[in-house]
UniProtKB/Swiss-Prot annotation:
<dbReference type="Pfam" id="PF01765">
    <property type="entry name" value="RRF"/>
</dbReference>
<comment type="similarity">
    <text>Belongs to the RRF family.</text>
</comment>
<dbReference type="GO" id="GO:0043023">
    <property type="term" value="F:ribosomal large subunit binding"/>
</dbReference>
<dbReference type="InterPro" id="IPR023584">
    <property type="entry name" value="Ribosome_recyc_fac_dom"/>
</dbReference>
<comment type="function">
    <text>Responsible for the release of ribosomes from messenger RNA at the termination of protein biosynthesis. May increase the efficiency of translation by recycling ribosomes from one round of translation to another.</text>
</comment>
<dbReference type="InterPro" id="IPR036191">
    <property type="entry name" value="RRF_sf"/>
</dbReference>
<keyword id="KW-0648">Protein biosynthesis</keyword>
<dbReference type="GO" id="GO:0005737">
    <property type="term" value="C:cytoplasm"/>
</dbReference>
<dbReference type="GO" id="GO:0006415">
    <property type="term" value="P:translational termination"/>
</dbReference>
<keyword id="KW-0963">Cytoplasm</keyword>
<protein>
    <recommendedName>
        <fullName>Ribosome-recycling factor</fullName>
    </recommendedName>
</protein>
<dbReference type="InterPro" id="IPR002661">
    <property type="entry name" value="Ribosome_recyc_fac"/>
</dbReference>
């Protein structure tokens, strides 16, 4: 029973780290990359659809992305969704593809993105700690109900704390890399 609780907690913590990676990838740096478009949704026949399901992305130059819609009728909606996103870009289309040129990041914009990254990192750590708290409550309940011994419960809590520290450290490491990437001129 304790092993299941610990395993479930670790899986949820792993998911929190994966979400943090995705969030960090969506934050714009000085270079273009396809992951920047992952969180953008466009209206496609009345349904909000992630644009990574509506188009393919390529990066022919460090500061330019080319978006090729699978369905040409979605071109205008995809372009509008990119324009309305928080990427701070003005896409242009030639009727077949959308070109997105990324301007150089100003120092002020870099600092804003670092704040966003720190917020996303803190959200991930809060999520990890929440998983830890729920797992600890489950372990305490098992001890209280007499299903496991006090010593076994304390060992499980120590293992849970070690797992929590490991995943929080992973988020800190991801954040450190993202900050370095953002400060790179």
């Amino acid at each position: 029973m304790i092993e299941e609780t610990l395993l479930e907690a670790e899986e949820k913590m792993e998911k929190a780290v994966v979400v943090a990676k995705e969030d960090f990838a969506a934050i714009r740096t000085g270079r273009a990359h396809p992951a920047m478009f992952n969180k953008i949704v466009a209206d496609y026949y009345g349904a909000l659809t992630p644009i990574n399901q509506l188009a393919s992305f390529s990066v022919p130059e460090p500061r330019m992305a080319v978006v090729t819609p699978f369905d040409k009728s979605a071109l205008r909606n995809i372009e509008q969704a990119i324009r309305d996103s928080d990427l701070g870009v003005n896409p242009s289309n030639d009727g077949n593809i959308i070109r997105v040129v990324f301007p150089e990041l100003t120092e002020e914009r870099r600092k804003d993105y670092i704040k966003v990254a720190k917020t996303k990192g803190e959200d991930a750590k809060v999520s990890i700690r929440s998983v830890r708290r729920k797992a600890k409550d489950a372990i305490d309940k098992l001890i209280k109900d007499g299903e496991v011994g006090e010593d076994e419960g304390r060992r499980a809590e120590k293992e849970l704390d070690d797992t929590t520290a490991k995943y929080v450290a992973q988020v800190d490491e991801l954040l450190k890399h993202k900050e370095a990437e953002l400060l790179e001129v």
